[in-house]
């Protein structure tokens, strides 16, 4: 069974994504990290296939902070795929920075908040 860790700002949004992924993907275990400060610990414990991290303009979900978490996760689990979720409608500059992180090879994929549930699940399944 593959595991995905969610590092999402809103607990309600995290649970919504969790339920959606469980409906769309078979044989996956979706685990919510309560806060970015616990994400590295969760990744050590569960050794996920992928980490889906939200990026916002607010600490502790800022791009630089999430990239630091990504680096710590990679030291312990170099095979873990990292996907960043950004609200492209709310912050176009941040969305462009996340795209640049993908171009630079710092993350494996990115998703805009406006994607469909099926597309999000397909991306997570295809890493």
Predicted regions and their residues:
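Conserved phosphotransfer microenvironments
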Residues: 51-75, 86-89, 94-97
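Output/docking surface of receiver
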Residues: 86-127
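Short, aromatic/basic amphipathic alpha-helical patches
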Residues: 17-21, 68-69, 94-103
